[in-house]
């Protein structure tokens, strides 16, 4: 039977519960255990797919097409285990299922309540799909005391009572703030956080204390005394310069051994060679390469979390520090671009939606193309690159994307159901219309995803929930989600990078390149080096006459890992390093 580990947080949010859960999973893996990591989010959205990136951060897409929390990216990057739709759940998804079942009469007329009905669905999610794993680590989003999180805490309390300590462990992450006037780390917020957790009925077995400096033995003893925890089970979590130093820091504190001791499991040696290799490369990274990221969502860099990490992975590969220059595309003009992109070694335009900030992005793309600066366009960045090429290189001055709903020559068009030759199925029907406060208006329409090899296997899991909040009359409104195969053209930059002619990458887009313009683009030097299996969707474009200019329709950042950097990011950083040396 799998053992369950619940990671909760207190005092403040964004303490690093996801990194802690991912680090522990990796450390247990290093001892030979099989681990699954899951995220339970208390918000009422069905999934993050329609949430403002400024507010939520990036939407992390799994192979099977689930739009999930960015913490699943940490889980994948640290453990190397591919996440799936069964690894993330929200309050919105839970209530969607609950209300649907109630309307269908599945509750046989009884009064439907938070306890036991909501908590039962949460428990079903946690306890399902556990075969083949030694440990299930569940991160509870938010902080203890949040109203929206109470059903989740109640559910894991019930699981703890049922499984007892032999099979269930609670880890609580708190903050020890440093007060400069007294030059002391304060333990009182941690004491109150544990008090709040115990009032719910959960007594933490391990306390992980986040601090900006070393924690004294007297502070640890004080925390242990007032929180009723043995001092050896109070684990310091000192701020690190790089998140990939965190797992080894936890290892040096004995976190995974404390977990195994709690479960009375014999200790075995850890195999951490690849992580020590990463740490060595990070510490040996003395040179820098400067990359400009041309962004729309400038209030939170978490909107581009996987892109940041993928760049860092390539930097680790070459023992280079990645110096990121964040450029708000709305403030970029023809007049100031030379000043803003001074001494840049590479330009990256990541994915996004909507018309806002596109002018600045296209100015940056033109600047990269005309100055022969290494360029990498991802998803929407690739689409804008084709529009820029059409307008300024080919001469199609009115080139536009259908997404903007303005008159012009549609270089980018909406995907239709026949654009993909693999079998597709409706994943979700959570159709809603939402307007971001400072964003674009978006239609969240019928979502399609390809059926993967294991999609036909019977699952006892009740989630993800199929909901219906609208009329799915317009079947052409599609979102191409998840991993799809892509065929590469031999002797191209892409084929050289991948060292293969068949790849599989994750997607999240509604629009694609209009194939009617392929010939005229090729006449002007554009190489189409990647296609979907039936060649209906262009996946990769290149300008081989330039130093390094590539746009991809997919999201390669989702598959990059610190010990296995993505080949396209490796080649992009290589080109940037060479450009830096030449200039």
From Swiss-Prot:
UTP binds at residues 13, 186-191, 222. Residues 291-582 form the Glutamine amidotransferase type-1 domain. It catalyses: UTP + L-glutamine + ATP + H2O = CTP + L-glutamate + ADP + phosphate + 2 H(+); L-glutamine + H2O = L-glutamate + NH4(+); UTP + NH4(+) + ATP = CTP + ADP + phosphate + 2 H(+). Gene3D superfamilies: 3.40.50.880, P-loop containing nucleotide triphosphate hydrolases. Keywords: ATP-binding, Glutamine amidotransferase, Ligase, Magnesium, Metal-binding, Nucleotide-binding, Pyrimidine biosynthesis. Catalyzes the ATP-dependent amination of UTP to CTP with either L-glutamine or ammonia as the source of nitrogen. Regulates intracellular CTP levels through interactions with the four ribonucleotide triphosphates. PANTHER family: CTP SYNTHASE, CTP SYNTHASE-RELATED. Homotetramer. This is CTP synthase. It comes from Rickettsia typhi (strain ATCC VR-144 / Wilmington). The gene is pyrG.
């Amino acid at each position: 039977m799998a053992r369950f580990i619940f990671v909760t947080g207190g005092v403040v949010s964004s303490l690093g519960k996801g990194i802690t859960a991912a680090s522990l999973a990796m450390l247990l893996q290093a001892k030979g255990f099989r681990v699954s990591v899951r995220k339970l989010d208390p918000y009422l959205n069905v999934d993050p797919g329609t949430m403002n990136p400024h507010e939520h951060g990036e939407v992390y897409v799994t192979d099977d097409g689930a739009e999930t929390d960015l913490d699943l990216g940490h889980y994948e990057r640290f453990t190397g285990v591919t996440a799936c739709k069964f690894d993330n759940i929200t309050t919105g998804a839970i209530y969607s299922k609950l209300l649907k079942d109630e309307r269908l009469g599945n509750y046989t007329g009884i009064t439907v309540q938070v306890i036991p009905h909501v908590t039962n669905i949460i428990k079903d999610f946690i306890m399902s799909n556990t075969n083949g794993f030694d440990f299930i680590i569940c991160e509870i989003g938010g902080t203890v005391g949040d109203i929206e999180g109470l059903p989740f805490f109640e559910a894991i309390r019930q699981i703890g009572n049922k499984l007892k300590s032999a099979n269930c462990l609670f880890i609580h992450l708190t903050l020890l703030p440093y007060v400069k006037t007294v030059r002391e780390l304060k333990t009182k917020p941690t004491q109150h956080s544990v008090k709040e957790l115990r009032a719910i009925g959960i007594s933490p077995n391990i306390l992980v204390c986040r601090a900006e400096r070393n924690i004294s033995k007297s502070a640890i003893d004080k925390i242990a005394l007032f929180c009723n925890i043995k001092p050896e089970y109070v684990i310091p979590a000192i701020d690190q310069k790089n998140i990939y130093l965190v797992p080894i820091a936890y290892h040096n504190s004995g976190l995974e051994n404390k977990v195994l001791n709690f479960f009375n499991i014999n200790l075995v040696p850890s195999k951490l060679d690849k992580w020590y290799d990463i740490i060595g490369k990070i510490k040996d990274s003395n040179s820098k390469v400067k990359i400009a990221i041309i962004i729309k969502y400038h209030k939170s860099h978490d909107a581009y979390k996987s892109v940041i990490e993928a760049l860092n992975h390539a930097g680790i590969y070459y023992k280079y520090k990645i110096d990121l220059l964040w450029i708000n595309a709305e403030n970029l003009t023809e007049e100031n671009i030379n000043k803003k992109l001074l001494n840049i070694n590479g330009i990256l335009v990541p994915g996004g939606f909507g018309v806002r900030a596109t002018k600045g992005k296209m100015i940056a793309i033109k600047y990269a193309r005309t100055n022969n600066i290494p360029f990498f366009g991802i998803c929407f960045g690739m689409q804008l690159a084709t529009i820029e090429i059409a307008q300024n290189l080919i001469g199609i001055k009115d080139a536009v994307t259908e997404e903007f709903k303005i008159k012009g020559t549609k270089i980018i068009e909406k995907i239709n159901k026949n654009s993909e030759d693999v079998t597709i199925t409706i994943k979700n029907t959570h159709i809603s219309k939402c307007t971001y406060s400072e964003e674009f208006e978006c239609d969240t329409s019928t979502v399609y995803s390809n059926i993967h090899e294991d999609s036909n296997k019977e699952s006892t899991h009740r989630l993800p929930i199929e909901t219906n909040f609208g009329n799915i009359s317009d079947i052409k409104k599609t979102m191409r989600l998840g991993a799809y195969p892509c065929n590469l053209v031999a002797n191209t930059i892409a084929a050289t990078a991948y060292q293969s002619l068949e790849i599989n990458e994750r997607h999240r887009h509604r629009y694609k390149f209009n194939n009617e313009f392929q010939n005229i683009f090729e006449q002007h030097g554009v190489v189409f080096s990647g296609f979907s299996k039936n060649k209906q969707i262009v996946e990769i474009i290149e300008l081989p006459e330039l130093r390094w200019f590539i746009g991809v329709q997919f999201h390669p950042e989702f598959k990059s890992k610190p010990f296995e950097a993505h080949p396209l990011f490796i080649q992009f950083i290589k080109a940037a390093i060479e450009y830096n040396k030449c200039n």
